Swiss-Prot record:
Feature: compositional bias, Polar residues: 183-195
Gene Ontology terms: cellular component: cytosol
Subcellular localization: Cytoplasm
Protein name according to UniProt: Translation initiation factor IF-2
Composition skew (Low complexity), residue ranges: 52-103, 302-318
Region G1, annotated ranges: 441-448
G3: region residues: 487-490
Domain tr-type G: 432-599
Segments for region (G2): 466-470
Keywords associated with the record: Cytoplasm, GTP-binding, Initiation factor, Nucleotide-binding, Protein biosynthesis
Region (G4), start-end ranges: 541-544
Compositional bias of kind Basic and acidic residues: 112-128, 136-178, 218-245, 280-297
Organism: Streptococcus sanguinis (strain SK36)
Cystine crosslinks: none
Amino acid sequence: MSKVRLYEIAKELGKESKEVVARAKELGLDVKSHSSSVEADAGERIKSSFTKAAAPQAPAEKPVAAQPSPQKTPAKEAAPVKAEPTEAKAAAQPEAKTETAAPVKRPQSRNFKAEREARAKEEAERRKQQGNRKPQNKEQGKREDRDNRNKNRGNSNDRDRGNRPNDRRDNRGQDGRRNGQNHQGFNGQKRQQPQGPKIDFKARAAALKAEQNAEYARSSEERFKQAQEAKEVMERQNRRKEQPKAEAPAPVQPAPAPSAPAANPSPAPAAVDTRRKKQARPDKKRDDFDREEEGPRKQQKNRSSQNQVRNQRNSNWNKNKKNKKGKGNNNQAPKPVTERKFHELPTEFEYTDGMTVAEIAKRIKREPAEIVKKLFMMGVMATQNQSLDGDTIELLMVDYGIEAKKKVEVDTADIERFFVEEGYINQDALVERPPVVTIMGHVDHGKTTLLDTLRNSRVATGEAGGITQHIGAYQIEESGKKITFLDTPGHAAFTSMRARGASVTDITILVVAADDGVMPQTIEAINHSKAADVPIIVAINKIDKPGANPERVIGELAEHGVMSTAWGGDSEFVEISAKFNQNIDSLLETVLLVAEIQELKADPTVRAIGTVIEARLDKGKGAVATLLVQQGTLNVQDPIVVGNTFGRVRAMTNDLGRRVKVAGPSTPVSITGLNETPMAGDHFAVYEDEKAARAAGEERAKRALLKQRQATHRVSLENLFDTLKAGEVKSVNVIIKADVQGSVEALSASLQKIEVEGVKITIVHSAVGAINESDVTLAEASNAFIIGFNVRPTSQARQQAEADDVEIRLHSIIYKVIEEMEDAMKGMLDPEYEEKIIGEALIRETFKVSKVGTIGGFMVINGKVTRDSKVRVIRDGVVIYDGELASLKHFKDDVKEVTNGREGGLMIDGYNDIQVDDTIEAYIMEEIKK
């Protein structure tokens, strides 16, 4: 016999394939899907089952429940809407026993107990008809049972919860009991298969599945209707927007239902017939909607019963999940698409080498993908994180029509640029500033006395040894105008400090004593002033002394290029007496006159820049720096970079020790707040914020450290011999601590200049501040001694130095330090000796004694021969042996020496070849004093 496929039967009947598959399974046929083939007679059975279900019946009364049979109605035909739920079942099975019941007010409620009893009776009858029919493939039957159980779980989750909220709890209870019965029945069949009557679980599962499909069809039908209504509403709204004057379209009406026999016509049966007719007719939109719903149904079939309970209780959770997947959300209006803003291209683009594609895209407000595409068209393969060179960036900007300009990199750590940058100072904001005057001269020529007279204070009395140890900055007022004075030391050791003073000054006052004349440091001060191109005012001091000769001073200065205006030069000469305050006013007037000629101006509106005059480490305040503001205005709390250090101006004091908040141009102030002590002579600059100042200071410190490491001496083939030779030179290790940075520099330079052959000075460490415990520890480890200049050790450092036997030498005058270091270096040398001949003796007789050696009898012919002297044996004018005496006797007595004209006996240690007429020359090694 020929076979026919299920989907062909469905097409012939106008039914869906899944309904035909479900009906075939209810009839006990072994089918899996719509592609399964059945015999022709089986196909006729399936067709007849649908024909019987569609036959009309006279509903004399409304049955409440009917006996279920294996031929269940299709899922779509059993979907009641606003009608009694058991009417379709009664029509499909007219021969079933029915029970009359009162009409139910809620059409959604069902009598599941009556349905189960009817199904049980029908299954018993069918077992009698089928007999002992068994599945041909036992394993296949087990697998189908498992599939049916999974479908039962999944389909139970697809029931309509929104339209039937009252049946939710009942459905869960009934489904749970049915699942439990199915599990128990399956397990019992597996364990006790030979015992008792056999139950057709396949038919039971098919019946349960048909019931669940019917419930799902009802919910699916309503969701489809809601979706259609939402689409119609959206279409009407869109048509109103496009054609405001057009009439709104009429809502789509469902197709008229065919007439069905009914005892009491009512709207509810008509609604049922309408949906049945609509379901029977193939509809493309309906099929599409069902296919959309098929995906979630398939996913829900394999969920556990626990998830089913959760989904039934929390309907919002399930709705949200469907909305996330885009299903069942057709009634919501779509969100308007955000239009992308269009940004115009800039006219100019400032770039730097190494910019990435992403950075360029952000600057020109374009997508990185667009730039990558343009680069690809230009032949450049790049990603958005790849850096581009300058040429590629320029070509890219040409493609966009943008003018490309390369950004000039500014070294933020470079302070010197503020002093040479033309645009830093505003020429329109320049104002007159006080002149900065530096007082220079030789030692004890009266520089500090002159400044003391100017300031009416007793600074000079506090200077040790009558010389200025470090620079001082002071400000006085004359005729309503301020003058800033810098005092520099005159000692030879302070050359660097004098040069520093000349570099920041506007006018130099050269103090020369009328009785001493021009001295070495006077000449040096002249050279510093000429190198800095600073005008010189000569103050001839000590004119009150009896031996003063100003004319001789003028002549000596003329020899060194300092010509008086009276002699046709450009230097002013003023004869003064600083001690007796003579002609001091004339000197100040001359200073103001020269300053007026120079037209000294500064811009107080910019951030302050200047030079460090002096720096020291205070125990309570930390690093203290004396600054001279050259441009701008310095304020308290300004972020500042000083040399290789940085910080914020915490406090600011003037030359009188008073706290100030503002310091203008040409004003000397002392500040605190730096992280380290800077070097004297360093430049400083105020930055816009503390972050920038910190970055610049750290970068400058890093560069200084790198420069110091690069300057480290390395051994090469050229200097290998010098290195080996230097190893023979002894070294004196020194640690220098002073009160100010200038004194540290002067001491270091002076000690390095000391030349003693065979000895060199190694400065292990130098810093400002008191001698502390770490200095003592370093000195003990490096075998050095500590020199303290105008500082004292702390009590803990002193105790530690005594315990570790570390020598601390304290001084307040620099030339005494130099003299002491010279003596120490000379004492480090090995002593030198010279030979001194003390006598001669002539051998007259020799005596050979066994076990003793040869004894030579001699007579001293010149000088003397001592026991501890060395002797040479000279024979025929040739030195035969040079050694020491083993014994010296006069007759039988041991003696220390034998003088001229006397006789004695001697033995030479290690030499017995003494002969008559040999000359014995006695000598000693005498140390040479240095």
